[in-house]
Amino acid sequence: LELAILMPLFLLIVAGVIDYGLLFWEKVVITNAVREGARAASRAADQGFGAKAELSPYQVRQVVQNYLDSAGVKAPNGQHLILSDETFSYFWSDTGSGIYLTVVLQNIPYRMLLLPAAQSIFSGRNSEEDLIYLNARITMAAEWTEPPTP
């Protein structure tokens, strides 16, 4: 009898540990993808008279996209996650103490695998609202002195 009472609670806890572990993994992957994009964006090609950025903003986005694809990050519908202008941004600023570039991933959707139904029960939301949105932002010093061309 005690097992019948405690088993559903135990299974819910195990499912929560698995789901939140996967959520944490995806957050780490997204952060690493942004970091790889910033590293690629910060590199400079020496042209003798000044350093120019090696990669265009589109190429930086492709570096981040390739990292996400290789890690197997998926959209909530199970398809590959495709970065758009709403989810990816890359910009730079000259602060006087150097040029800094920032790579941002925002509103990357994640759907819990085992607990979406339980999440709806406890929160009163419908399945369309089950998404959790992850963000990652990295700012890094640029090696170049001449900004990239779009």
Question: Model segments located where?
Answer:
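Short, conserved structural patches
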Residues: 40-150
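Alpha-helical assembly-interface signal, strongest on the long, hydrophobic N-terminal helix that forms
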Residues: 1-68
